[in-house]
Amino acid sequence: MTQKSFPIAPEFLAAANITAEQYAEQYKQSIASPEATDAFWAERAELIDWIKKPTKISDVSYDLEDFRIKWFEDGELNISVNCLDRHVRNNPYKPAIIWEGDHPSLHKIISFKELHEAVCRLGNAMRKLGVKKGDRVTLYMPMIPEAMVAMLACTRIGAVHSVVFGGFSAESLGNRIIDSQSKLVITADEGIRGNKRTPLKANVDRALDMDGTDSVSNVIVVHRTGNSVPMSGRRDIWYHSLVDGESQHCEPEVMNAEDPLFLLYTSGSTGKPKGVLHTTGGYITYALSTFRDVFDIKEDDVYWCTADVGWVTGHTYATYAPLANGTTTVMFEGVPEYPTWARIGHIIDKHQITVLYTAPTAIRAMMKEGDTFVRESDRSSLRLLGTVGEPINPEAWDWYYHVVGGSKCPVVDTWWQTETGGIMLAPIPGTVAMKPGAAMNPLYGIVPEVIDTDGVALEGAAEGNLVINSSWPGQMRTIYQDHARFLTTYFTEYPGYYFTGDGVQRDEDGHYWITGRVDDVLNVSGHRLGTAEIESSIVAHPATAEAAVVGMPHDIRGMGICAFVILKSSETATESLKSELNRHVRSEIGPIANLDAIYMVNVLPKTRSGKIMRRILRSLAAGQYVGLGDLSTLADSSVINELVEVVKTERAKSH
C-alpha cells in the first residue's frame, strides 16, 4: 500500500508549534505506562482553570463486572469560566464570535466581554425559571450567536444541554425531549439557510404535542426572522424580553469533573437514537488539548469550523475548544452555495480566516462547481486546512490542498466520533508528511489497535476493526438512561477495548486509514444515520410491508441512502409512490434522510434464519452484479437474479 505523500511547506514548518521528533518523543512518553499517561494528562489539565485542582487523574476499568471511566474525579471547575471569565480578565475586547449571517450583508462581532454578559443574563433568567444543576435543557436552534450563548448559559448554571440539529423533524425532536426529560426548550421563530426558512417554533409546538413531553415547563424563543409564530401564554417566552434587565453577573455553579455536561443524540445500529453523555472536566481538558495540538493554534488565529452546533464537531471544535483557548471562532448561518459557490472564499477574505475546518461533503460539492468560484477570492490569510466527518477521497483532498489552500496549507484529516469527545487520529501539522485520505497518527495518550473479527490484535500492515486500547479524558461515560446498551455497544464484542464501529487499514509506515463503518450505521455527509431508524420509518408507511436500507456511493455526500422495499400485495410500484415514501421518511427523520435510490422488489435476500444479507444489497446498490461472495447461507439463491434485474432496469432509467 504505497501512497503518494506531500511534505509540509518549509514556511509552515518554520513556525509550527511542534516538530516530528517532539511528537514522537511525547507520544511515546504519553503511552509508556498507566502512570506516564496519568502524568501526561495531569500536565494537560494545567490548561484549565480549576476551582479545585484534581489530585486523582484517572480511575478506569473496562471489566464489565467492575466497569468505570472517571477522569480528574476530585477536581471542581466551571466550563463557562474557562471559556469566558478568564479571557474577559486578560483580553475583554478580543472577538470571541464572528457571526456571518445567511445573507452576505449580515455579520456581527461579539467580544469575550459581550459574550460573557449575554451568557450571564440568560443564565440568571434560566435560574429564575427554575432550571437547576442537573436539569436537562433542549436547544433547537439555527446557527446564530444565541445558540452558543445558550450552551454556555447551561454550563454556567450546571444544566445539561441537549442540542438537536435544526434540520431534524418535529418527531425526532420530540423523541429526544422525551428521552432526556428536558425542563426547558430554547428555539427560534424560524431558521434561515440558503434563503430557505425552517419552521423551528412550529416544529417545537408539534414535538410538545407528543405524549411524554410534559417535563417541559417553558419554551424560550429567539426572534430571528420576525415571521409571526403562535406563542402559548404561560409556556412560551420571547428570549429578548426575558434577558432584558437581567444582571451581567451570574455566579457560576461549582461542578465536579464527573458531573454531566451535555447529551448529544447520535444514531446507533438499532432504531432508537442514543443519548451520548459527556462529563465536565475530562471533556474540556481533551477538547482544549487536542484543539491546540491538531490546529497548531496561534494567539491571533481566526478559526472557522463550519459544523452546525447540532453535531458534536459544532460542540467541541466550533464552541468549547476555541472559546476555552481564547481563540476567535467564526459561526456561519448559511450554506456554501448561497448566494453563489464563491461564498466560502468571500467569508475567508472578509474575516481574514487563518484555519478552516470543514467536511469532505462540502469540499466535494464546491469541487463539482469547478475552480472559478474559489478563485474569486484571495484566501491568502489561510495557513491550515482540516477535514472532519468521514474519510476524504484523494481527489477531493488534492483539490482542497491545491486549489483552496494554494498548495501551502497543511491538511489535517481528523478521525473521531461523537463518543470520543475530540479528535483521536490526525497528522499533527509539522510532524509528518501528509497522505491524502489518511487520518495518519494517534494523538497523545491514544492507543489504537487493528483487530480481526476474532478479537486478535494484528501487527504491522493490516486491515480490520479499529479499537482503542485505553481510556482518554474526552471519552463518553454512558448512554443516557441505558448503561447496559453502552456496555453492549462499545465494550462487549472485544473485551478490554473500546470498539469504534469503524474499519481501518494500517499501512507499512504505521499510518491509519479509516475505511468506514462496520456496523449498520450510515455516514451521510459526515452525519450518522441508523439503518434501523430509516427502515422503521419506511415500514410505518401504509403501503410498505418490509424494507432494507444500505449505503451506496454518492459523488457529493460520500454515501447515499438506498432502500429495497417490499410493498403490500394490494399496492403497485409507481414513481409517485416512491416520491411519497421519500417525503414520508424526510418528514419523520429530517431532510438528511433523503432516499437516493428506492428499489421496489418482491423479495429480500435472507439467510435460513431470516436475516437479511445486507452485503449483497450493498453490492447491488453500488452497481456490482457479479462476484457477490458466498451465497451458501441464502435460503433461496434464485432471488439474486430477480434483484439484479430490478436494480439494472431502474439504474438504466435514471441514467
From Swiss-Prot:
Similarity annotation: Belongs to the ATP-dependent AMP-binding enzyme family.
Molecular function GO labels: acetate-CoA ligase activity; AMP binding; ATP binding; metal ion binding
Entry comment on modification after translation: Acetylated. Deacetylation by the SIR2-homolog deacetylase activates the enzyme.
N6-acetyllysine modified-residue sites: 611
Gene this protein is translated from: acsA
NCBIfam families hit by this protein: Ac_CoA_lig_AcsA (TIGR02188), PRK00174.1 (NF001208)
Reaction equation(s) it catalyzes: acetate + ATP + CoA = acetyl-CoA + AMP + diphosphate
E.C. no: 6.2.1.1
Transmembrane segments: none
Gene3D superfamilies: 3.30.300.30, N-terminal domain of ligase-like
Name recorded for this polypeptide: Acetyl-coenzyme A synthetase
